[in-house]
A protein has these predicted regions:
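N-terminal glycine-rich phosphate-binding loop for ADP-containing cofactors
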Residues: 1-164
């Protein structure tokens, strides 16, 4: 996860710097986080909120923090699912149970869709930026998938196998 304040610090007009965080797949997902720093002016936020609306998105203004809102809240969802797999619960069972509980897809199908490399990098970044809390420690299973090149749909294999 990028720190918008770090980018803004190098900009000649940091008050005109903010972020827009779209969700994958961006053509389908309606949510966009509009990320403000401590120096972002209100006009910049208004422009980005309107841009989000013009793009057919639902903009939510949030503070510049590790993972912003969605990625920070999603970390425990992924990490606890990975911990269950480490404890021997079958991945298809975890996905099926969470899909039956109302999630659009289970966590492993979602990680494969997003890309295991991206998801693992975000997990590591949020973990480090928040001071390495044990509850957010990235999973060894996910680290292995990335090391093996099993990045999900984009590589043809991840937690599941896909036809390219």
């Amino acid at each position: 996860s990028l720190a918008i304040a770090s980018i803004a610090a190098a900009h000649p007009f940091p008050n005109r710097m903010a972020g827009m965080h779209f969700f994958n797949p961006a053509t389908i997902m309606k949510l966009v986080e509009v990320v403000e720093t401590t120096v972002t002016d209100a006009e910049t936020i208004q422009v980005l909120v309107q841009l989000g609306k013009d793009l057919g998105k639902v903009p939510v203004v949030c503070k510049d923090s590790p993972g912003f809102i969605v990625n920070r809240v999603a970390r425990p969802y992924y990490i606890e699912s990975l911990r269950l797999a480490e404890e021997g619960v079958a991945i298809p069972v975890i996905d099926a149970l969470l899909a039956a509980a109302g999630f659009k897809m289970g966590p492993f199908r979602l990680m494969d869709l997003l890309g295991n490399d991206i998801n693992y990098a975000v997990s590591c970044g949020v973990y480090e930026q928040l001071g390495e809390p044990g509850r957010l420690k990235p999973s060894f299973i996910q680290q292995q998938k990335v090391a093996q090149g099993k990045l999900g749909r984009k590589s043809g294999a991840g937690y599941y196998t896909y036809n390219k």
